A protein has these predicted regions:
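Hydrophobic anchor at the beta1->P-loop junction of P-loop NTPases
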Residues: 8
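P-loop (Walker A) phosphate-binding loop of NTP-binding proteins
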Residues: 11
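Pre-Walker A (Motif I) flank of P-loop NTPase domains
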Residues: 2-5
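A basic- and aromatic-enriched beta-loop-alpha substructure that forms the phosphate/nucleotide-
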Residues: 64-101
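NTP-dependent small-molecule kinase module
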Residues: 147-203
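A glycine- and Lys/Arg-enriched "phosphate-lid" helix/loop adjacent to the NTP-binding pocket
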Residues: 90-150
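Conserved substrate/cofactor phosphate-moiety recognition/catalytic segment
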Residues: 21, 25-63
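Conserved lysine of the Walker
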Residues: 16
Length: 203
């Protein structure tokens, strides 16, 4: 499988940013990072305010779309590229936070914008149980189990591109050279579809 554009995914705490940076360095590829930090609708002043979840979700969706279009216009995807997010995953958070009326509007906008987004050649989904994610994030958010389950459900049914599911419970998230070499071998052996990979314990 020729992988010029690889997207790394997983819930926060799965280690996607670190892996994306390591892969980009090893492959001499451009690194694309999610730019949705600084969302003005996620501050404490907006928590619980009617419509704030919808505003926050649209901010993320439009920001990711703008970044993707800028990259495509710059012909970045003709070169080796590693991203720490998949545009399609925006829907995971939308279905977690929006009500039915908001989802109806969101879905129509998403359908329009997604047509202009370049699909990766391969998605790598970093998977781990809730208790592992919670320990890594030092997070007591009661919604975390629902979010992790939403990611698992989304990628269980994901068919848009080849998908490599990596079980990360027992690995060193700094991705030392040996672990990265093993992962790259798995990527090179991909022939499309969906495959599961449990790395050797490197923690």
């Amino acid at each position: 499988l020729e992988c010029r554009y690889i997207a790394i995914e997983g819930p926060a705490g799965a280690g996607k940013g670190t892996l994306a940076a390591r892969l980009a360095s090893r492959l001499d590829a451009a690194l694309v990072l999610d730019e949705t930090d600084g969302n003005p609708f996620l501050g404490e002043d907006h928590v619980g305010r009617p419509g704030s979840a919808f505003q926050a979700q649209l901010f993320c969706l439009l920001g990711r779309h703008r970044q993707q279009i800028t990259l495509r216009q710059g012909d970045l995807f003709s070169h080796a590229t590693v991203s720490d997010y998949l545009f399609d995953k925006d829907k995971i958070y939308a279905f977690q936070t929006l009500d039915d009326n908001e989802l109806f509007i969101y879905q129509r906008l998403y359908d329009l914008l997604s047509r202009e987004v370049t699909q990766p050649d391969l998605v790598v989904f970093l998977q781990a149980p809730v208790e592992v994610i919670r320990r890594r994030r030092k997070d007591r958010d009661r919604r975390l189990p629902e979010l992790v389950e939403a990611f698992n459900h989304f990628f269980f049914h994901y068919t848009a591109t080849p998908l490599l599911v990596v079980e990360t419970s027992q690995i060193d998230l700094t991705w030392p050279d040996a672990a990265l070499d093993d992962l790259l071998r798995q990527i090179q052996q991909m022939h499309g579809g969906k495959q599961y990979y449990v790395p050797r314990n490197s923690a």
